UniProtKB/Swiss-Prot annotation:
It catalyses: 2 GTP = 3',3'-c-di-GMP + 2 diphosphate. Pathway: Purine metabolism; 3',5'-cyclic di-GMP biosynthesis. It is found in: Cell inner membrane. It comes from Escherichia coli (strain K12). Keywords: Cell inner membrane, Cell membrane, GTP-binding, Magnesium, Membrane, Metal-binding, Nucleotide-binding, Stress response, Transferase, Transmembrane, Transmembrane helix. This is Diguanylate cyclase DgcN. Residues 1-24, 74-112, 176-408 are cytoplasmic. Induction: Expressed at low levels at both 28 and 37 degrees Celsius during transition into stationary phase. Its main location: membrane.
Length: 408
């Protein structure tokens, strides 16, 4: 049992397993979404940056047209520098029709730049943007631009940071909602397992699983409750059968009084109770003319007499004293709350008077039947055997004395 408990403690709970599954699913889903959105965003940004740089180059051609026509290098350089200071490109070249460099401008970095920025710049713009310069419909030169990576890298970092933040926020909301939605599942399963555990551990078949909102759990609850109904009914029948067997084992089937087995158990319990022994006594009672009744009117009449004897003993004892049938016409009674031997003698006299009343044989006849009574005080004996020996001895003495009186 201890090993089973330790094994259960090592196993994850349904709530924890469900939470782990949800966390794993959310993490994988959000990572895939993050990767998909990141790649899509960067590809879109690449197209946007290339078109923006091409648009810048196309705009510059109108400013450089006159300088190229007149081969005015300083004017072209001044134009490139003015536009380059705005941070839209890092290098610019103006070439004439013969591919001679007429003017150029380079952005001077204050730092060498990080690897990521260089990689982004090379990936977005693997080659300079080339835009022809036209005059009167004829190509007279070209301008070549290379984008500046700092602004692009910053924008990419910012976009990824915002995207990551949104993904984390969405993950947090998803986790919160998932836990809230899972509470119903966890509580439903916990309710079922609590009932099953209580039934198994405490044999409490009166427990029932409450109705559940989820169809499968509800169907299981109905089936399990039906099973519990059958088990409870079976347990009640078993308890009733056991009670009947116990009563049969401890009671006389004819008179309904407690039998010899119950007497032995009761007298041993009494002798082991030091307080009860001080105020108790044992009576043995035996019929004096029961054989005559059996021989004269038959055993059925004898049984009716025994039933009447048991009835009178039970009514006399009430809730205070306990009567037993030991077998045949032998009876016993344990007296409780008696303070002296004289009180016991008074009880014996009262019993004798009760049995002086005639018995109705239900066949048109009546008869009398006396009982010989012997008693023993429990306080005077250390064992149940000695107590019974004295009570039995005194009973037979009383029987002999009654027989002698009848002879005289």
């Amino acid at each position: 049992m201890m090993d089973n408990d330790n094994s259960l403690n090592k196993r994850p709970t349904f709530k924890r397993a469900l939470r782990n599954i949800s966390m794993t699913s959310i993490f994988i889903t959000m990572m895939l979404i993050w990767l998909l959105l990141s790649v899509t965003s960067v590809l879109t940004l690449k197209q946007y940056a290339q078109k923006n740089l091409a648009l810048t180059a196309a705009t510059m051609t109108y400013s450089l047209e006159a300088a190229v026509v007149f081969a005015d290098g300083p004017a072209a350089t001044e134009t490139l520098a003015a536009l380059g200071q705005q941070g839209q490109f890092s290098t610019a070249e103006v070439r004439d029709k013969q591919q001679n460099i007429l003017a150029s401008w380079h952005y001077t970095r204050k730092d060498p730049g990080d690897t990521f920025s260089n990689f982004i710049s090379h990936w977005l713009f693997p080659a300079p943007i080339i835009q022809p310069i036209r005059h009167n419909g004829e190509t007279i030169g070209e301008v070549r631009l290379t984008a500046r990576d700092s602004s692009i890298s910053h924008f990419i970092w910012f976009s990824l940071a915002v995207l990551t933040g949104c993904i984390l926020l969405a993950s947090g909301i998803a986790i919160t909602l998932t836990r809230h939605l899972h509470n119903g599942l966890v509580e439903a399963l916990k309710n079922i397992t609590d009932v099953v555990h209580d039934v198994r551990s405490n044999r409490n078949f009166s427990r029932r699983v409450s109705e559940e909102r989820i169809a499968e759990f509800h169907r299981f609850a109905l089936d399990f409750n039906s099973l519990l109904d059958e088990m409870e009914e079976w347990q009640l029948r078993l308890q009733a059968k056991n009670a009947q067997l116990l009563r049969t084992a401890l009671h006389d089937p004819l008179t309904g009084l407690a039998n010899r087995a119950a007497f032995r158990s009761g007298i041993n319990t009494l002798m082991n109770n030091s307080d009860a022994r001080k105020t108790s006594a044992l009576l043995f009672l035996d019929g004096d003319n029961f054989k005559y009744i059996n021989d004269t009117w038959g055993h059925a009449t004898g049984d009716r007499v025994l039933i009447e004897i048991a009835k009178r003993l039970a009514e006399f004892g009430g809730l205070r004293h306990k009567a037993y049938r030991l077998g045949g016409d032998e009876f016993a009674m344990v007296l409780y709350d008696v303070q002296s031997e004289s009180e016991v003698q008074q009880i014996c006299s009262a019993l004798t008077q009760i049995f002086n009343l005639p018995f109705d044989l239900h066949n048109g006849h009546q008869t009398t039947m006396t009982l010989s009574i012997g008693y023993a005080m429990t306080i005077e004996h250390a064992s149940a055997e000695k107590l019974q020996e004295l009570a039995d001895h005194n009973m037979y003495q009383a029987k002999h004395q009654r027989a002698e009186k009848l002879v005289r």
